[in-house]
Amino acid sequence: MSKTVVLAEKPSVGRDLARVLKCHKKGNGYLEGDQYIVTWALGHLVTLADPEGYGKEFQSWRLEDLPIIPEPLKLVVIKKTGKQFNAVKSQLTRKDVNQIVIATDAGREGELVARWIIEKANVRKPIKRLWISSVTDKAIKEGFQKLRSGKEYENLYHSAVARAEADWIVGINATRALTTKFNAQLSCGRVQTPTLAMIAKREADIQAFTPVPYYGIRAAVDGMTLTWQDKKSKQTRTFNQDVTSRLLKNLQGKQAVVAELKKTAKKSFAPALYDLTELQRDAHKRFGFSAKETLSVLQKLYEQHKLVTYPRTDSRFLSSDIVPTLKDRLEGMEVKPYAQYVSQIKKRGIKSHKGYVNDAKVSDHHAIIPTEEPLVLSSLSDKERKLYDLIAKRFLAVLMPAFEYEETKVIAEIGGETFTAKGKTVQSQGWKAVYDMAEEDDEQEDDRDQTLPALQKGDTLAVRTLTETSGQTKPPARFNEGTLLSAMENPSAFMQGEEKGLVKTLGETGGLGTVATRADIIEKLFNSFLIEKKGQDIFITSKGKQLLQLVPEDLKSPALTAEWEQKLSAIAAGKLKSAVFIKDMKAYAHQTVKEIKNSSQTFRHDNITGTACPECGKMMLKVNGKRGTMLVCQDRECGSRKTIARKTNARCPNCHKRMELRGQGEGQTFACVCGHREKLSVFEKRKNKDKARATKRDVSSYMKKQNKDEPINNALAEQLKKLGLDK
């Protein structure tokens, strides 16, 4: 009997498909049933070959070899997942298999994952496509009843290949040209370089900003504070201090008369469910998690604990087929501290509405929500628990009723001038009951509501004090990882002067990068020492500034990505041949390399040290990495690097913040931002005192984490080994 191979993108999805398709026989990287064989990728198993794959002459980076444009580009199996590729290939090539169902993610990249595997395996069998937005049993069953011909998605595949090949052709050649021309480790690309340019633009705006003082007036009356409002502009501040000085003088001794009372019943609905970017923003804001860290923790909640749905989603809505599963999901999380809210929702009944259910706004995957898996909070690490809490509370909030309140606005007059105050009376906490109010209170001080006394129109109030308030306009805030993610998702503010069509295209296609790649892009900018962190703020380095002066202008603008997306969409729609687009990209690569070769600019290492590289003898560069300070060889091919100061997991005995380990050998010293300094030898003695309280498991776990965080030159881990606490 002939069988059908179903190719999923990940093992977890493969297991879901296998369960529905009754494939229970376990094999090496697959599950088999009477009719179907379900196997899976691990994301991409196949990729485009590096330049070295086209000949030994490309192992060395030389300007005269550029541009490198192989015909055609070759596919290679990714080494670290080669075992799974072979497992998939063995199923695809079975003689009893006469059909393939592509069940990877419903999108451009999902199509590429599957088709490249099939192409590299050299399989020529009929293809069907499973195109579903969620992996519930119902969705899978309906999807298999409506399988579509693979030919319908060939244009989508062509657009995916075009995107990948264009990124290779432009990225490889521009990076090698910059690195060899300027003898510095420089990299660029159509996503990372515009992202770097946005950081530089923000820094330039901050440096060019001139603060302007402003002034206002507050009047303290019985039971409340009134704020002066300009009658014409309706603003509560003026940039002319003469205005407030004159008013303070003229209004002395005057009473306030209530001219108007406006009472309005209002409702506030819960914020939308999380997509990956919004969750990364919130996790950074609440807990200081990096974008990469959030994705890593989220992946564990999804794959290991099975407590949340697919992480790499760009949708903040659910599809209608998920609604019948909501009760089971609620029951799975019916433990403290969520049980009381689950009980309220079940008692009230689950009411779906367009605030969180919208099929039109779900593409590949729906929003991140809890699964029906029973929640055991004690099995989660601190970070996992924090992230789950964000997801769980947002999920509960959208199922709760609206927050209802009555807003009262008081308009009073003092000596003919208008003063206002706002108050709020809560009628029903609704969804806000789920949250600690301190979490949600992001309002500016000027806008905060007061508890107002009982008032009537015409009431006269004694003015106790009149006070001038003042402040200064503030420059734009520097990016942190959360706000940078937002800018990447919506870069329109950095596209002034570009065609409206390009701005619109980027808005429709999700901005720079994807939800799955943005964290890696930011991490790459850190690891390339193009940006650095000071506290939570991101600064562009001297190297980053110089790179932007050296790269062609096109590569610095988000417009390049927008132009590509327009053409890739046309390829997917069958309106443009991919060969035409690739021909343009090859011409663009030639132009870019030529521009870099002919550049008269130079790159200056302003961070060069007097320390010679132990490998090649060239002077090393001092760079601030994401986790500490390093010495890096200026020769890219040497690649030697050494950590000289780094953030550790050792806590300051005074303020309990993480300390930095500085220096080399016996002179190594821990330093904390609070000013505490502690020699490594003193640290060892303190650890010895705690030895009786530290279990082998504690120390082993600690050292594993240290090695995972930063395996290079980890002096702290070495010293812990010497203490023998892990024996």
From Swiss-Prot:
Signal peptide: none annotated. One of its GO terms (cellular component) is cytoplasmic replication fork. Its cofactor is Mg(2+). Residues 187-192 are annotated as: Interaction with DNA. It catalyses: ATP-independent breakage of single-stranded DNA, followed by passage and rejoining. GO terms for biological process: DNA recombination; DNA repair; DNA topological change. The active site is at Y310 (o-(5'-phospho-dna)-tyrosine intermediate). Keywords: DNA-binding, Isomerase, Magnesium, Metal-binding, Topoisomerase. Residues 153-593 form the Topo IA-type catalytic domain. Residues 685-699 have a biased composition (Basic and acidic residues). InterPro entries: Topo_IA, Topo_IA_2, Topo_IA_AS, Topo_IA_cen, Topo_IA_cen_sub1, Topo_IA_cen_sub2, Topo_IA_cen_sub3, Topo_IA_core_domain. Residues 3-136 form the Toprim domain. Its EC number is 5.6.2.1. Pfam families: Topoisom_bac, Toprim. Belongs to the type IA topoisomerase family. This is DNA topoisomerase 3. It comes from Bacillus subtilis (strain 168).
